[in-house]
């Protein structure tokens, strides 16, 4: 009893809500075997024939290729495409493809050479000896994608399933009217399909493998049952004919009773589905080592004289296939790629066959009926009753027409499979599927823009965070660099500050000198001697090289002599015209001694310096200029008055002069004498004699004012003190 119940549950099938029963129209093409089509002279292979990004080109214009040679590299979801025949690549350029708007996509254009030579093929007849990862990689690199219409890369789908797949479903329903590609493939290649199913089961290791096929394919059912007679790991389930039973979510519910959640995938409930055409392509890729270069395409419709199913090479122009089938176009002929419910009309016939092309329908005008005008929605809810996804098409229609994207998303417009059942039953002839496709495209564009904006914002915030981190790191480095001075440095700073304060305090104290006593300058003298000793030590440690002294120019000497004579004449004239001032003989003697010392020094310097050559013309010019200046000074000197002289100041200056004279004589005796320029000495001597004559004349001509004896005595005493102090200082300096 339990065994009978288990057997009953094993063959149990479920149903889904909605669905329609349109005319099947399959008998036009499923009665003839598969046949080959002659090679087209030119093939157009789009780089993107699947869901995902296009692969990277690995050929260039002018390359010769063989059938099965990879034209692109596949990484990740980038599925490679292969050459459908041998020939030459003549162009790599955009070309219109299988799209409702015939959008241009980058394509490789090949001129066939007619030889149809294959690449070297290496099949894995013992595929069980290879790992799961190696099999998946081979399937991916051989370009196998979902041939049921989605075009999802099979290798990526198998890799994503992982170990959570418990049920493998093979979709053999083929529910849309007119299409018989899978039906004919199962009738002619049932054994190869089953072998491909076993390879998929070996990769996924599911608990059960189910084949779902509609009951309107009796020949295909009988062929599969014959092949599966001895197979107990694969179950064939025959389901009632209802459109769209071939949808992934609908067939999953029919065979397992499980519903795929909104926004989810069948793998979320442990189910993975593959098409029978995909299973056949897997077998050829793994066992035979042949990449996917062709597929079965249904050519049907009353405008075709020889309908049937053919092996069409990928990249073959649609026009070439239709002409081979006896296409008889009318004035307003349309050609549909796909079925009448989910397909789209081609704008022209130069588009190529791709991996998702399963049917080319060329109906007559009477077959499709006259186009009817779109009317307003009457809210009859017939579309909601027919929807297999349990949606509300009338609400989605209003949201799509009113650009209310948020409400359309909230009503699960993404779950629409675009089966066309709602448009089929609509009494107002509203093309609901077109509205839904447009709305989903707009929502996808908005989401893509939001994603880009979010990525840009994330990059901006990351940059700002990085800049803040760098700024904080810089501030931390600056704070660590600003180290407080060590204890010994602080002690040195404190000692320096104490010395400065002590000096300031000493400077502010008043200096008191008692009457009749000399000031005590011993501390100042000691400090000065210490500084002088330090300076002499530095000079001894770092001797400086005397710079070479250029010789005197005779022209300059002549000019200076002329100036000296002019000054002498001026002083003589002043002495003759002005009253003479009294002259101090001591001061005159001091000045004479100073003049003699300077003369000796200049003579020594003149003896060691070479003389430069003198131009006589320039010397004469300069002498004339000097005489002119002297005459001008003589004229100015005649008009200037003389100032009176104070005898007390004269006495003080005489005492200071005597002290300086003694000091200079002592220095001259102890220090090496410097060379003296005789010309400068002569000039200075002349000036000194002129000054002496002037003072003598002033002394004779000017009356002497009577002086106060007390003030004179005080001045003389101060002069003697200063002279003694100067003499002591001189002795100290010599020591």
Swiss-Prot record:
Keyword vocabulary terms for this entry: 4Fe-4S, Cell inner membrane, Cell membrane, Electron transport, Iron, Iron-sulfur, Membrane, Metal-binding, Repeat, Translocase, Transport
Ligand binding ([4Fe-4S] cluster 2): 387, 416, 419, 422
Binding, [4Fe-4S] cluster 1: 377, 380, 383, 426
GO cellular component: plasma membrane
Cofactor, free-text remark: Binds 2 [4Fe-4S] clusters per subunit.
Disordered: annotated span: 534-711
Residue span, 4Fe-4S ferredoxin-type domain: 368-397, 407-436
Annotated localization: Cell inner membrane
Keyword RNA-binding tagged: no
Keyword Ribonucleoprotein: no
GO MF annotation terms: 4 iron, 4 sulfur cluster binding; electron transfer activity; metal ion binding
Pfam families, alphabetized: Complex1_51K (PF01512), Fer4_7 (PF12838), RnfC_N (PF13375), SLBB (PF10531)
Family to which the UniProt record says this protein belongs: Belongs to the 4Fe4S bacterial-type ferredoxin family. RnfC subfamily.
Function of the protein: Part of a membrane-bound complex that couples electron transfer with translocation of ions across the membrane. Required to maintain the reduced state of SoxR.
Protein name as catalogued: Ion-translocating oxidoreductase complex subunit C
Native species: Salmonella paratyphi A (strain AKU_12601)
């Amino acid at each position: 009893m339990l065994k009978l119940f288990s057997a009953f549950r094993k063959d149990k099938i479920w149903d889904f809500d909605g669905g329609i029963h349109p005319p099947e129209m399959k008998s036009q093409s499923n009665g003839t075997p598969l046949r080959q089509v002659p090679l087209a002279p030119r093939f157009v292979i789009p780089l993107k024939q699947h869901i995902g990004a296009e692969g990277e080109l690995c050929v260039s214009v002018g390359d010769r290729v063989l059938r099965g040679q990879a034209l692109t590299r596949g990484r990740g979801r980038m599925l490679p495409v292969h050459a459908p025949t041998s020939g030459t690549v003549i162009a790599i350029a955009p070309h219109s493809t299988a799209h409702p708007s015939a959008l241009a996509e980058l394509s490789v254009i090949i001129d066939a050479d007619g030889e149809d030579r294959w690449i070297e093929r290496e099949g894995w007849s013992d595929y069980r000896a290879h790992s799961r990862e190696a099999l998946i990689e081979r399937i991916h690199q051989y370009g196998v994608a979902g041939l049921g219409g989605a075009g999802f890369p099979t290798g990526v789908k198998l890799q994503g399933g992982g170990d959570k797949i418990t049920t493998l479903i093979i979709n053999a329903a083929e529910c849309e009217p007119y299409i018989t590609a899978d039906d004919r493939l199962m009738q002619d290649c049932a054994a190869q399909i089953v072998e491909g199913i076993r390879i998929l089961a070996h990769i996924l290791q599911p608990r059960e493998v189910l084949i779902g096929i509609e009951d309107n394919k009796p020949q295909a059912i009988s062929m599969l049952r014959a092949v599966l007679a001895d197979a107990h790991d694969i179950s064939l389930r025959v389901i009632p004919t209802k459109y769209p039973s071939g949808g992934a979510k609908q067939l999953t519910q029919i065979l397992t009773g499980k519903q795929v959640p909104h926004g989810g995938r069948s793998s979320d409930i442990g189910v993975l589905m593959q098409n029978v055409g995909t299973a056949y392509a897997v077998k050829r890729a793994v066992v035979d080592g042949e990449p996917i270069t062709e597929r079965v395409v249904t050519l049907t419709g009353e405008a075709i004289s020889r309908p049937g199913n053919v092996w069409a090479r990928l990249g073959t122009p649609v026009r070439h296939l239709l002409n081979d089938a006896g296409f008889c176009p009318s004035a307003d002929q349309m050609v549909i790629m796909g079925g009448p419910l989910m397909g789209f009309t081609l704008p022209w016939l130069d588009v190529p066959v791709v991996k998702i092309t399963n049917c080319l329908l060329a109906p007559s005008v009477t077959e499709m009926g006259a186009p009817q005008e779109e009317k307003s929605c009457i809210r009859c809810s017939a579309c909601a009753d027919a929807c297999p996804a349990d949606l509300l098409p009338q609400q989605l229609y209003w949201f799509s027409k009113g650009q209310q994207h948020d409400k359309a998303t909230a009503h699960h417009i993404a779950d629409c499979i675009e089966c066309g059942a709602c448009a089929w039953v609509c009494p107002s002839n509203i093309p609901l599927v077109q509205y839904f496709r447009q709305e989903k495209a707009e929502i996808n564009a908005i989401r893509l823009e939001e994603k880009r904006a979010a990525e840009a914002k994330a990059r901006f915030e990351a940059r700002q965070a990085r800049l803040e981190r760098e700024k904080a790191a810089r501030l931390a480095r600056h704070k660590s660099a600003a180290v407080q001075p060590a204890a010994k440095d602080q002690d040195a700073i404190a000692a320096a500050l104490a010395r400065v304060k002590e000096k300031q305090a000493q400077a502010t104290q008043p200096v008191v000198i008692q009457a009749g006593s000399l000031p005590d300058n011993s501390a100042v003298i000691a400090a000065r001697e210490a500084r002088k000793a330090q300076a002499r030590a530095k000079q001894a440690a770092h001797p400086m090289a005397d710079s070479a002294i250029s010789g005197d120019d005779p022209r300059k000497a002549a000019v200076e002599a002329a100036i000296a004579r002019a000054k002498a004449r001026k002083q003589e004239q002043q002495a003759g015209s002005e009253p003479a001032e009294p002259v101090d003989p001591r001061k005159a003697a001091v000045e004479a001694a100073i003049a003699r010392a300077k003369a000796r020094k200049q003579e020594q310097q003149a003896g060691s310096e070479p003389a430069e050559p003198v131009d006589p013309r320039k010397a004469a010019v300069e002498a004339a200029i000097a005489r002119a200046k002297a005459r001008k000074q003589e004229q100015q000197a005649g008009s200037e008055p003389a100032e009176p002289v104070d005898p007390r100041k004269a006495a003080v200056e005489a005492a200071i002069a005597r002290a300086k004279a003694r000091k200079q004589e002592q220095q001259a005796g102890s220090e090496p004498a410097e060379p003296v320029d005789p010309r400068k000495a002569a000039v200075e001597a002349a000036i000194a004699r002129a000054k002496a004559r002037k003072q003598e004349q002033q002394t004779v001509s000017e009356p002497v004012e009577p002086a106060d004896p007390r003030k004179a005595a005080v001045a003389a005493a101060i002069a003697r003190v200063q002279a003694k102090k100067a003499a002591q200082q001189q002795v100290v300096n010599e020591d």
